[in-house]
Amino acid sequence: DVCSSDLNVSVRIPSVFNVIKVETAGEMNKAIKKLIPSQDIFISTAAVSDFKFEDKDTHKIDSSKALSINLKPTIKIIRQIKELNPDIFLVGFKAEVNISKEDIIASAKQQIKDAGTDLVIANDVSDENCHFGSDNNKVWIVDDDIVSVPLSSKKEIANIIFDVILEKI
């Protein structure tokens, strides 16, 4: 099963997958709660927003005066996965901006600690060759080991990630 939002997805998902369309973090959370108990592997590629509007206006906002917007944190979906299915093999992604390799790896290891991920794919999206929407990337695959994947096509990286997952399960 694939739970997806069309907001930022430009990849064609093969028809062998059951696609569940969602628009909000809440909808994704609800769909995942139904799916996770019956799955063996969960690859959490979604970049779910960390914040949402605290209040929604139901009327037109007056543009003649200053405006303050209050945000509140959204639920961290990935942190619920192991609670729903302790035996699932959980793969997370960690995108960072303008930080060192050591800090990216530390951030990935923190996700392993916080969410119970078995494997984290980490990268720096501020790199001009590896930004969101780019066809290429360079990543670190992190668990007890660290595999550095140099600049490669995203398809090549996906194959490497799947090879690592298959070695681990």
Give the positions of each predicted feature.
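Glycine-rich phosphate/adenylate-binding loop
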Residues: 87, 104-169
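Flexible loop/turn segments at secondary-structure boundaries
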Residues: 12, 99-100, 129
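Structural signal for short hydrophobic segments within the conserved structured cores
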Residues: 18-20, 147
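Short loop/helix-cap segments at secondary-structure boundaries that form the rim of catalytic
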Residues: 10-17
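Short, small-residue-biased leader/transition segments that mark boundaries at the very start
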Residues: 1-4
